[in-house]
Curated annotation (Swiss-Prot):
Main location, first listed in the record: cytoplasm
One GO BP annotation of this record: L-histidine biosynthetic process
Class in the EC hierarchy, top level: isomerase
HAMAP family, A to Z: HisA
Designated name of the protein: 1-(5-phosphoribosyl)-5-[(5-phosphoribosylamino)methylideneamino] imidazole-4-carboxamide isomerase
Keyword Isomerase: yes
Catalytic activity: 1-(5-phospho-beta-D-ribosyl)-5-[(5-phospho-beta-D-ribosylamino)methylideneamino]imidazole-4-carboxamide = 5-[(5-phospho-1-deoxy-D-ribulos-1-ylimino)methylamino]-1-(5-phospho-beta-D-ribosyl)imidazole-4-carboxamide
Family, similarity comment: Belongs to the HisA/HisF family.
SUPFAM superfamilies referenced in this protein's UniProt entry, alphabetically: Ribulose-phoshate binding barrel
Organism: Thermus thermophilus (strain ATCC 27634 / DSM 579 / HB8)
InterPro entries noted in UniProt: Aldolase_TIM (IPR013785), His_biosynth (IPR006062), HisA_bact_arch (IPR006063), Isoase_HisA-like (IPR044524), Isoase_HisA-like_bact (IPR023016), RibuloseP-bd_barrel (IPR011060)
């Protein structure tokens, strides 16, 4: 299982939001320094999120460029990618893969065109949810769509990488909801990356036991609760 550090960008800084709430952020300084530190500690992939684009409050294009120029490892880019043009821009900024969420829920036709344009290796889908209650538009809008029905539809469309985040737990260090993660794993037959609440090596062991392919970790890395250099969770 791959451990993937998450660097969220807001107003040019690396931050973590508590339960996805933009009013409850913890700043962690220069995102380039954070990205380089994670790379030096052994990360093989970085998850970069432009929160301002996701929330419609601005963008961090230049910061993304700086991060891309500083890294020798690949990164995936998420946040506000809601058009073919935005998708192409994300990849042109250096991302090895773009991640879409709102589009995948609200506009399956556009998702299909995106998949056709760049292929499933360069496009992942994010399922952001409070448990299994799906949320979109920077986690600010709940929708009635069934999470498990969406998973089936995306698999049939050709999506091959899913990022599931439990927004209730994101940035809280409260640990995982084992039952929900198990249900998502059972419903999704392809690559699954999970985030939201991961707080300790025990959470990583749990994900590994459930057959999850990757763990998105943010606050626990910043706070030193999990260290990339330590391999104990892999055993």
């Amino acid at each position: 299982m791959r451990l993937i550090p998450a660097v969220d960008l807001k107003s040019g800084k690396a931050v973590r939001l508590y339960e996805g709430d933009p009013a409850r952020e913890t700043p962690y300084g220069d995102p380039v320094e954070a990205a380089l530190r994670f790379q030096e500690e052994g990360a093989t992939l970085l998850h970069l999120v432009d929160l301002d684009r996701a929330l419609g409050t601005g963008e961090n294009r230049e910061v993304v460029r700086r991060v891309a120029a500083s890294l020798s490892i690949p990164f995936q880019l998420a946040g506000g990618i809601r058009s073919l043009e935005a998708l192409q821009e994300a990849l042109s900024l250096g991302a090895s893969r773009a991640v879409v969420g709102t589009v995948a829920v609200k506009d399956p036709g556009l998702l299909a065109r995106m998949l056709e344009a760049v292929g499933p290796d360069r496009l992942a889908v994010a399922l952001d949810a409070r448990g299994l209650e799906v949320v979109v538009s920077g986690w600010q809008e709940a929708v009635s769509a069934s999470a498990l029905d969406l998973l089936r539809a995306w698999a049939e469309m050709g999506v091959r990488t899913l990022l599931y985040t439990d927004v209730r737990r994101d940035g809280t260090l409260l640990g995982l909801d084992r039952e929900v993660v198990a249900r998502v794993r059972a419903a999704w037959p392809y690559e699954l990356i999970v985030g939201g609440g991961i707080a300790s090596p025990e959470d990583l062991h749990l994900l590994q036991a459930l057959g999850v392919d990757g763990a998105l970790v943010g606050k626990a890395l910043y706070e030193g609760r999990i260290r990339l250099k330590e391999a104990s969770w892999r055993s």
